[in-house]
Amino acid sequence: SVPPLLKASWRLQATSLVLFPFAIVQWNKMDEYIRSNILLPRNLMIILASGVCLFLHFGTWGWSLVNTSLTHSLLFVTAHPLVFVIGGIIIGRPLLRKQSYGALLGFVGAALALISVNNDSEVTLLGDLAAFAGAVAIVGYLSAGRELRSWMPLFLYAFPVTFIAAVLLTFSSMFLEGTGINEISSMSSFGWTDLAWLPAIAYLALGPGLVGHTGINGVLKWVPPIVISVSVLIEPILGTFIGILIGTANFPDLWTLIGGSIIMCGLYLVISAEEYDLVIDTEE
C-alpha cells in the first residue's frame, strides 16, 4: 500500500539518521586539510552528483518493482557491469576481449528475456527499462564514490550522499505520488516512524543501508567499482528465490530463465576480465 518513491525515501531517511552520528564523530576528529578539501566546490559538486545518482537509482528501481516482475527488475538493475563497458566504448577506452564477449552475451540475454513482455502479464518493457535506468544511475554513484573515497572519511561521504537522495525522493513522492506530512502513515512522508512500519525500515537502514551501501562505499577506497559488481551475480537468483518463498514473486517463465542465465554469464565475463586486467597492472 506504500508507493514506491515514498518507500525508498523512508529507507534513506532512516539510513541517514543511522549515518549522522558517525559523520559527526569523523568531522570532529578530522584534520583541517581534509576538511578544507571536502568543502572545495569541485568535491561538493561530486557529492551532490552522487546523491542525485543514488536518488535516481532508488527511484527508478523502486518504480520498476511494481511495474515488472521481481526477477526482471533484479536482472536489469544489477546489469551495471554492462553499463561500465558501454561507458568505456563511449569514451574510447579499449575493451578486453572477454569484456566484448560479455557485453554481447549480456545484450543477447536481455533481448531474449524481453520476449517475456508478450508472454508474462507481470513483465513490462517500461518496468524493465526503469530497472536498467537504475543500473545506469548506480554506475554514477559508484564512480563518484571511487573518486572521493580514496581520501575522504567513509561516513562524511556516505551521510550527505544518502541525505541528498532521501530529500529528493521525499519531494518527488510528494509531487508524483500525492504523499504529504499529515497523511495517513502509508502515505505520509515520515510514516516509517509509525510502529507498523518501523521494524521493517529499521532493518533496511541497518542491514542493506549501513552494512550494504555504506559497506560498498567503504571498500571503494581500495577496490574499483566494477570488481564490486561481482556480488550482483547472486542477487537475481537469491532475490527471486526469496520472493517465491514469501509469495511476492512467481516462478520465472522460460524466456526469463534462458535470457537471465545468458545475462549473468555475460556479467561474469565482464567482471572477470576487469579483475584479470587489475592483476596484470599490479604485476607490471
Regions found by a protein language model. Give the residues of each.
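C-terminal transmembrane-helix exit sites in multi-pass transporters
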Residues: 18, 80-104, 237-257
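Hydrophobic/aromatic residues within transmembrane alpha-helices
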Residues: 7, 11, 64, 90-95, ...
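Membrane-interface helix termini and inter-helical loops of multi-pass transporters
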Residues: 1, 33-34, 114-124, 176-195, ...
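C-terminal-most transmembrane helix of multi-pass membrane proteins
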Residues: 8, 12, 116, 197-199, ...
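Hydrophobic alpha-helical transmembrane segments of multi-pass membrane transport proteins
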Residues: 22, 48-67, 112, 129-144, ...
